[in-house]
Amino acid sequence: SMTLITAVCILLLSFQFSFAQQSSVSIQVDASKPVGDMRPIWSFFGYDEPNYTTRKDGQKLLNELKQLSPATVYIRAHNLLTSKGDSPGPDLKWGFTDAYKEDKKGNPIYNWIIVDSIIDTYIQRGMKPLMEIGFMPKDLSSKPEPYEHTWSKGGNLWTGWTYPPKDYNKWRELVYQWVSHSVQRYGKEEVTSWLWEVWNEPDIRYWSGTFEEYCKLYD
């Protein structure tokens, strides 16, 4: 009604008048007096496509990010364990490394070539990786099909890479082999200076398993 609209307008005007009447606030900072360490939260960067790391434009961007901060710059890329799938072309959104496959007997085959090239690129620039353990390789997924995502309207993005492992012992061995390989390649001192995390945003659709199944990834 007109009466209600008038009342709302008067209320809004009163708020505006109230804010205008507020007194100014003076803040003084004594820069000569330390109050604690300033954590360089600005020196962490991340992106979806891990293979962008080794491309010309990707390396140029990493150089620029490194120059932004005197503090150590950490880089986190998704999909460091994701499989390529069956598509003949590149998976330009999510990316892949094909680090894990299984032979016909179910024996694991580890291939760290792509992962190494990504981590090498960080190390060469004095950066540190924030190693994201994920996502689920196709041959280890408890629901591998479909694995590739689709971009059509209403298409499924959250496919086989979002599911728990079909065998948690194989998952544990995969993580162990990855860390062991990293220590052999870069040295224990270097690897212990990295940050590690399990998955990305498991509270949303990046994880299609249960809460309990996610927690079991840490066992």
Residue ranges of model-derived segments:
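Bacterial N-terminal signal peptides
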Residues: 3-16
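Substrate-binding/catalytic cleft of secreted carbohydrate-active enzymes
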Residues: 202-212
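Non-catalytic accessory regions flanking glycosidase/transglycosidase catalytic cores in CAZymes
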Residues: 19-195, 212-219
